[in-house]
Amino acid sequence: MASNPLDNNMPTTPVEEKIPVASYSPSSSGSSSGASLLVDIMCGSKETEDEEVDSDEWDKPETENISDLDERSEMVRYLRASGYAKFLEKYLIEEELPVRSILKKLGINLPSALEEFEDIDLLPLLKEVLKREVARRIKLPHFNTFEDVVNLLKKAKNVVVLVGAGISTSLGILDFRSDNGFYARLARHGLSEPSEMFDIHTFRENPEIFYTFARDLLPETNHYSPSHAFIRLLEKKNKLSTLFTQNIDNLEKKTGLSDNKIIQCHGSFATATCIKCKHKVDGSELYEDIRNQRVSYCNECGKPPLKLRRVGQNKKEKHYFSDGDSESSEDDLAQPGIMKPDITFFGEALPDSFFNKVGSGELEETDLLICIGTSLKVAPVSELISVIPPTTPQIYISRTPVRHTQFDVNFLSPYCDWVIVEICKRAGWLNELQALCDLPECHSGSKTRAFETDLDIKFEEPSTYHITSTTNGSC
């Protein structure tokens, strides 16, 4: 079995044994997974209502003075140069700084819920912060502009593309984490923990929650966007190594993209499986139930067994009839299993194809990574960027920026399609992209918006582009 390079847990070090607090035990002072979850919330950009802790992001220089930034930079440099153990020894042991002070100097503002915690109980959180800082990729300084991206695309031979829901928003499909996304809609309908809709344990106990809201995720179109077409264009040019998609709409396949190029990280609506007998069906068989907010049950294990009784005096005769009126027939009825679309819920393992690809070593050959329409908040897919060699150029295309890693060039736009069309125009690929978008499988509305909107392009140093419509900022 391939090793999992996404497993980067940091072991307990001898330095922690030197910490002069008798009550501290590295094995019992907190859950590393809990600390990881807290850092996910505190260090991710605040985009939706499902994130309950409203805290500062990693980098907000406008709220800090120069000396604070210099001190943080020095601490980070020391951490990267000397390692986790030396860092703890220097700041916790030698300088005797409280854990909460170190966290604050690193840009982590504790939520009020943690203010009453004993200082030493915050050590698992500090450990998680340091682990992430060490793993965080540093931007390559020599890739900054549109021209750099065009040159990278022309030279690349092993492009990895990672996409999220933002690639399909031009088709009218909701993303998850924007202000008007799916999670925000669930919150407005009173679902206190929107992500519970995709929790496998909740689904098994109360499938009505999923079936009440799933119709908003059901693909209403079989047509792809210009951004999908761009990925197919990369394959046609023999540049695409792998597409990792977090989407469940299955639209990537509508472009004609080869199956062996696609890793569906979170499954799709293409098929569905009974959680009881594992009977598998085409996903479209559930669509009527989903659209009517009705739980879908299995037609296979839900069939009542035929109760037969032999009649006639001659034992050699084989005449039987159904005894549907028997008192025991009601007991013989099988409880049908619940049908679940083959999408990956929280609490379920990702497909083997994902881990096989990540563990195969193929990603080490990547010469360009392009992330499109994803906030990179759901592990382990979000950790792919740490598997790609840090010297590989990385491009980010989405509506909002990410704070927990550094891409080389960022393109921020209400529609990813606008960015894609502009890149292809500058690369001399516009006619080829247009040809793919002229096919009947391409969504006509998204094609018109992508190719006919006049764009306003603003550059923000050192390497971020803001791309909007010249008329009203969007369209």
Curated annotation (Swiss-Prot):
The active site is at H266. Its cofactor is Zn(2+). It comes from Schizosaccharomyces pombe (strain 972 / ATCC 24843). GO terms for cellular component: chromatin; chromosome, subtelomeric region; mating-type region heterochromatin; nucleus; pericentric heterochromatin; rDNA heterochromatin; Set3 complex; subtelomeric heterochromatin. This is NAD-dependent histone deacetylase sir2. GO terms for molecular function: histone deacetylase activity; histone H3K14 deacetylase activity, NAD-dependent; histone H3K4 deacetylase activity, NAD-dependent; histone H3K9 deacetylase activity, NAD-dependent; histone H4K16 deacetylase activity, NAD-dependent; metal ion binding; NAD+ binding. The gene is sir2. Residues 1-35 are annotated as: Disordered. NAD(+) binds at residues 164-183, 246-249, 373-375, 398-400, 416. Binds 1 zinc ion per subunit. It catalyses: N(6)-acetyl-L-lysyl-[protein] + NAD(+) + H2O = 2''-O-acetyl-ADP-D-ribose + nicotinamide + L-lysyl-[protein].
